[in-house]
Amino acid sequence: MHARAALAVCAHYLPVARGARLMAAYTGVSVSTGFMAGVRGKAAARLGPFMDRARELLRQAGVLYADETPARANGGLHYVHIACTEFLTALHTGDRTKEAIDAGGVLPGYTGTIVRDGYAGYEHLADAVHAWCGAHSLRDLAGLYRFDPEGQVWARSMADLLIWANKQATAARADGQASLTDSQLDQIRSWYRGAVAKGISDNQHRRSQIAKDGLRLARRFRGHQDMILRFATDLTVGFTSNEAERGVRPVKVQQRTSGGCWRTLQGLADYAIVQSYLSTATKWGIDALDALTQLFTTGPWLPAAVRPG
């Protein structure tokens, strides 16, 4: 009964009243909205061993994807943070400070590569190698070029480079190559530096706001070349942080079905824990109901390694 209730409100994001009606319709057993509201907390309370295991394995992974998304709880704005791979997910809650990022217990001291957006809150993680999400870079470039296509030709050139370089990296991985060729990397770096130089020269003597924005973006690309091109220089690193963005997308779904917010901070924290479990189980091909049934009977399912096999 607990597993089916958790499936309704945790895996399918149903409001508690609708979940109670669904339980009655499918099982013939009437349960209260209070029972449905409390099942997520009961599940979260059993998931300590899982969260410990997930954090341990994530810290062993060579590449992690990180992101954060806003969530309203207890009348205020908070954040759900994620650290994940293709097979593991760990979510936690807090504000947007570096202390809150560290509180997830995965990123502090991590020595692999973190693929992320350009948010400065991750910069203190000095033990890790950093890679910027290519999708974010493309959105920034497209937004600039859209408003001034004649004056921001460099942005189009840079976007074309990133798209082309990603195709080269994808093809190299598919062919089993360990890296791009020196010739390819030289071409990528030369194209990159040329686009940056044009962005600076075309904007530095203009006074319009779009020119200031263009200069700022060109200088950002100049200062973060290694992070932006990490996907090309290290083929184990993905082009985007979409894995992390997909992992936090259910936060928005749950928020919509919860009247726009969580009533308590503990409720939001419980959500993050249970969603970590369900997301990881799904990535391993385990049915959500099976994972929840095991949780409420013999204890949580635990991933055996960083990846299956």
Where would I find each of the regions flagged by the language model?
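Catalytic center-proximal scaffold of phosphoryl-transfer enzymes
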Residues: M1-G309
